[in-house]
Amino acid sequence: ASFTNMATLSYNGSQINSNVVTGELRDALTITKTAVSGGYRPGDTVTYVVTLSNTCTAALTGLTLTDDLGGYTAGGQTVYPLAYEAGTLHYYTGGTEQTAPAVTAGPPMTVTGVTAPAGGNVTLVYQARVTEFAPPGVEGEIRNTVTVSGGGLATPLTATATTAARLEPELTISKALSPAVVTGNGPLTY
């Protein structure tokens, strides 16, 4: 967003206006979310990377990150196509892993006590398991939104990662031999 400003000078009944200056307002905190996955099937695990970048000269503390785990309404109730995998949160400040803040698995998943350092970034990496509520098929996708709030932010910030359903079949093959021990020229069954 941009803004403009002009000054007015008044003296002895005269008035003069200055030139108009234009500036740009940038968000002090930005958020991105990425799904590290080529698609999903029920039971798969999807890794998410959330990065908060702080351009302020002061750290932003007391932030809360809320992941909606892709929740949507079906049949009058909210269902969740993702479930946070406990113990998978990794928390990096400036690229160095730190002790992870408190996590509530939810749904929704909530991480409290997040700090975005002055002029730096914080990255959270975690995994979620795909549940039976994940939409299958050609049009199937999970829209997973994360919101950051608190820490003096005027309004919450959001970022969304979309992951599509994998359509290729999951094939397996196995072969067995009977009997396991065969004498010379004896019969085998596969």
What are these regions (language model features)?
Residues A1-Y190:
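Exported/extracytosolic protein signature
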